[in-house]
């Protein structure tokens, strides 16, 4: 079938017309009722009256501009055309472009093209971020006739919606061109992608709820943009672990690195949060779409202002009755008490929880972690770095836990002078030769190293036998994202954890350590994390080039780069160690009631001891064992 560009666009939109109507709160089917939306307007809408540091403000602007660049490129499907290469240029979307982009972002395009073309949106995203001005597949000619393939013949009486169902969307020329395109000729700019993933990670921290609450929490979390940015860079290092924060503008990501990174970990994170930003309207993207009428106003930027809103006043979409836009005062948009700024932890934050949540989703874990179902059980900085203290705090929790361990890479001075480290090193088997360089190209002496272990089963005293199941996994959080899942084995059955309170510490992916008289020795697995008994030093080991005699409990890295086949260790001095319980609201309430009861019992016992002290002292004085002056008696 031959038709013009606009006819093709018209065939796409009926498939999602009802969705778009409800989302945009359109009050008319008249195309003249809406106009364009600029990226600058969206940023202004969200930052109005909000105190955010200048760098965060600039990077949010860049992220929204990049988002609009991607949406504009996708929104011109099936005749995509890249806009200007200038990142600072304000990008505007028409309603038609917004609608078509939403078809892809919402995932509804799969109904049109089939699941075989699921990678198409990642190609569009990569091309849009690659800044290749020559990647326009079609002439910009509205009068040119295009041929579109059909599944079924078009009849004269068919409506546009019926015609859309008869089009073979998967057979479009653009799909063929994308399939044959050598994507490796393109290079993605990680500095652009970093701003976008920071926006997505911030969105990840916001649970699905009413729109006004989601937007309030988004605005609140903007104040910690730099924390989200730090973890976003760690996520991007999953694609290329050589990315440096100081030199991002001169670095690139290849299509191979990008596609493997997306497929192995990041695709669910990007897909879910891209949809949340646009479809759930966290950024209020659709609000500045407005009716063109005599009652509309103009603000100082040259954009029109929706009816009912005043210039310089923040607005949010009304949740019920679909009544469009309603003005709210700054007091009404302040974040409520339910928005927590921190967890009372030096290590764990809202941004870190969002980071872990995104990784667990990408791995396919059934365990969900949010700021609402996590409770701190142990913190070394509060309770002391003691194996007994750790044991007392975590053994009463009967749901999954997350163990965080963080510190600084061991330096040569510690190796040469710290006797406690030397004793630990003597009991931990060496793999590398003394003359080998222990640091790989992506490892630096000043690295902050952070690992997180997901323990699905309750903690057990395991001085003789390991415990655990195959849902256990190790997450590398800093300086780069990576993950190590439990190896499926009918023999091991995921029993890969020990908690040894008799002098050998904690092991994840290790065999039981030897601890007899003066003979102590660790047996680390090829992929393992070992924490010595004083909770002072830790070692993560990854042997990827060859198999050793050690039992393998965890799978090796699936990093797209050469890391999967590398032998390396992260040895670090522990500065923070925390354990957090993950459970339902019911489990949290039951655990809190149990802790409260135990505190009351402890206070009662202390009270009894104080009351009985007088009687006990009297007997001791009568026996002459304690003098009246309280300094002891004489015989």
UniProtKB/Swiss-Prot annotation:
* Segments for region (Disordered): 297-333
Compartments in which it is found:
Cytoplasm
Membrane-crossing residue ranges in chain numbering: none
Q: Which residues form the TLDc domain?
A: 346-583
| Keywords on record | Cytoplasm
Which PROSITE patterns does UniProt cross-reference here? TLDC
Q: Taking the first listed entry, what is the main subcellular location of this protein, grouped into a coarse class? A: cytoplasm
Q: Name one GO cellular component term.
A: cytoplasm
InterPro entries for the chain: TLDc_dom
A Pfam family it matches: TLD
Highest taxon listed in the record's lineage: Eukaryota
What family is this protein classified in? Belongs to the RTC5 family.
What does it do?
May be involved in a process influencing telomere capping.
> Protein name, please?
Restriction of telomere capping protein 5
Organism in which the protein naturally occurs: Lodderomyces elongisporus (strain ATCC 11503 / CBS 2605 / JCM 1781 / NBRC 1676 / NRRL YB-4239)
């Amino acid at each position: 079938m031959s038709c013009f560009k606009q006819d093709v666009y018209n065939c796409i939109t009926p498939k999602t017309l009802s969705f778009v109507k409800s989302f945009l709160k359109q009050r008319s089917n008249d195309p003249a009722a809406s106009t364009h939306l600029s990226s600058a307007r969206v940023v202004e809408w969200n930052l109005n009256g909000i105190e955010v540091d200048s760098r965060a403000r600039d990077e949010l602007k860049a992220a929204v501009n990049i988002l609009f660049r991607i949406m504009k490129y996708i929104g011109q499907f099936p005749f995509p055309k890249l806009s200007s290469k200038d990142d600072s240029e304000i990008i505007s979307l028409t309603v038609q472009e917004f609608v078509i982009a939403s078809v892809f972002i919402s995932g509804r395009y799969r109904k049109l093209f089939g699941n075989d073309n699921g990678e198409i949106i990642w190609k569009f995203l990569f091309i849009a971020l690659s800044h290749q001005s020559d990647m326009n597949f079609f002439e910009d000619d509205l009068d040119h006739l295009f041929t579109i393939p059909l599944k079924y013949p078009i009849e004269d009486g068919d409506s546009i919606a019926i015609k859309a169902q008869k089009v073979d969307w998967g057979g479009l020329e653009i799909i063929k061109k994308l399939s044959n395109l050598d994507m490796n000729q393109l290079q993605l700019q990680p500095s652009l992608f970093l701003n976008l993933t920071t926006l997505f990670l911030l969105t990840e921290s916001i649970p699905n709820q009413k729109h006004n609450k989601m937007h309030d929490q988004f605005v609140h979390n903007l104040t910690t943009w730099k924390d989200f940015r730090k973890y976003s860079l760690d996520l991007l290092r999953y694609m290329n672990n050589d990315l440096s924060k100081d030199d991002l503008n001169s670095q690139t990501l290849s299509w191979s690195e990008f596609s493997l990174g997306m497929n192995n970990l990041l695709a669910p994170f990007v897909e879910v949060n891209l949809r949340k930003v646009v479809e759930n309207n966290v950024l209020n993207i659709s609000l500045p779409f407005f009716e063109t009428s005599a009652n509309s106003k103009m603000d100082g930027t040259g954009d029109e202002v929706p009816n009912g809103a005043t210039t310089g006043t923040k607005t949010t979409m009304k949740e019920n009755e679909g009544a469009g836009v309603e003005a709210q005062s700054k007091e009404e948009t302040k974040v409520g008490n339910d928005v927590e700024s921190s967890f009372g932890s030096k290590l764990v934050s809202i941004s870190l929880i969002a980071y872990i949540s995104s990784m667990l989703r990408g791995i396919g874990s059934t365990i969900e972690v949010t700021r609402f179902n996590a409770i701190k059980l142990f913190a070394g900085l509060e309770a002391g770095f003691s194996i007994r203290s750790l044991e007392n705090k975590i053994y009463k929790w009967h749901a999954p836990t997350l163990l965080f361990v963080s510190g600084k890479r061991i330096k040569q001075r510690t190796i040469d002078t710290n006797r406690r480290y030397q004793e630990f090193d003597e009991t931990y088997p060496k793999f590398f030769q003394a003359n080998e360089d222990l640091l790989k190209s992506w490892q630096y002496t000043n690295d902050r190293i952070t690992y997180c272990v997901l323990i699905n089963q309750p903690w057990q005293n395991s001085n003789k036998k390991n415990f655990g199941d195959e849902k256990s996994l190790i997450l590398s959080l800093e300086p780069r994202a990576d993950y190590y899942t439990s190896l499926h084995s009918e023999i091991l059955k995921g029993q890969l954890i020990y908690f040894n309170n008799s002098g050998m510490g904690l092991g994840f992916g290790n065999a039981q350590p030897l601890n007899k008289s003066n003979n102590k020795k660790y047996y680390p697995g090829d992929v393992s994390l070992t924490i010595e008994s004083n909770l002072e030093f830790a070692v993560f080991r990854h042997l990827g080039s060859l198999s050793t005699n050690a039992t393998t409990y965890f799978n090796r890295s699936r990093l797209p780069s050469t890391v999967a086949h590398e032998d390396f260790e992260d040895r670090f001095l522990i500065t923070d160690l925390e354990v957090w319980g993950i459970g339902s609201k019911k489990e949290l309430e039951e655990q809190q009631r149990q802790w409260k009861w135990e505190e009351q019992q402890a206070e009662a016992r202390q009270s009894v001891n104080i009351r009985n002290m007088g009687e006990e002292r009297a007997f001791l004085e009568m026996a002459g064992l304690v003098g009246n002056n309280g300094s002891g008696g004489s015989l």
